Each structure stands twice: as structure tokens, then as C-alpha cells.
Amino acid sequence: MAEPVPPHDDFIDGVAVKDVVAGENSGSRFRIYLPERNDSSVDKLPVILHFHGGGFCISQADWYMYYAVYTRLARVANAIIVSVFLPLAPEHRLPAACDAAFAGLLWLRDVSRKQGHEPWLNEYADFNRVFLIGDSSGGNIVHQVAARAGEEDLSPMRLAGAIPIHPGFMRSQRSKSELEQEQTPFLTLDMVDKFMELALPIGSTKDHPISCPMGDAAPAVEELKLPPYLYCVAEEGSDKRH
């Protein structure tokens, strides 16, 4: 699952993949998935901006588990996927990953304004249909980026929706589901605690707004200008913490 998959310009199973750097000095890196198109098609494609999971400490946008999921999504949804290479803790503590993710959204906005250039996006992207998606800690980032986007002029681009997939929302106090959930070697509560200790700003607890956007320290959801959300949470999953 954690093996990196190299990009390929050829369409393999209907999808081509390339890695790009946005700007010479920004250091922002993205992986772009482009579905193969019918020669007669003139319709532009929606854009899905993806933030990977990994507890803010592990994982990369080019790992096989993401390649497998997002090549399929690009093909089935007929959408362009743009996945952000996120800076990882503890070398880069939060909000570094959120800042990089938001920079990715602003890069898409710049391309939509012709202030940036990316051939696949310039030719095929429908910037009126841009969505955010992220799994686990990437779901937390989806919420942070969506909240910031509400205070930003994104025109002519439009943020059409956000999809947090089993977001890693939690509190300092263990939830009922955390206490009842059977632990596995793949992910234990101690591992989650360690990830948060390494990722959150020094001195912060899991009640920090990034890990606990429903807590008292976070702005009220009613006060945020958010796009439509589709939450994906598995029953009996370890992320039913709120």
C-alpha cells in the first residue's frame, strides 16, 4: 500500500498521471490524474482536490493505495483529480499541512484566472465545479480549507462541495466509540495519540480546532461560509468520535 507509483503520461486503464511543481519558488507539488476522453467530447471536467490521510505524520500522495483509489475515481467520475503532496510532522507541525492544502486551492484559482499554467487543467478543467476530498486526517484538512475558502475571493473558480471521508475528529476525552472499538495492529489509540502529539502545535491538546472542529476552541460551524458537505463515516469505525 505504501509503495510509491511513478507517474505515466500514457493512459493506463483509462487514466494518465503526472506530477507537477507549482511555481519555481513555492515548492508546492501535486499529482494530477486525467481520465481518457472521447475525441468528440467537448465538455470540461470537474476538478477534485485531494488531501491524503496519515495522521499528519505519514503517507504521500503517490502511494499505491491512493493511486489505486484515485485512478478509479478519475475514470468512474470522469473528473480530474489533483492530489497535494503535504508536509509531514514532526518536521512540519500543524498548521503546515493545512497551509499547503489551501495553497493548492489558491493555485487552482490562479490557473482558472490564467495567472498560472498547467496544460491539462487549462484545456480540460471546469473550474465552476471544484470539490475537496480527503480521508482521515485529510478529512480534517478538507474542513480547514473549506472554512478558509469562505473568506477568500476564488472567482472565477467555484468551490462546489467538500467530502470528508471518515475525518479524524477527536477530543482530549475518549469518546464512547473509541473506548468500545476493538483495536488492531493497523491503528491503535496509542498510535493516534502519538500522531497528535507529534503533529499538533507544541503545547496543544486534541481539543485544538484542527483535530476538534466541533469543540469550544473552534469557530461555530454556523458562522462559517461552507460549501455543501458530504460526510462519509463507516458504522462501527474507529472515527465515530463525535
Task: Give the residues covered by each predicted segment.
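Cytosolic, low-complexity regulatory segments enriched in Ser/Pro/Gly with interspersed Lys/Arg
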Residues: 1-3
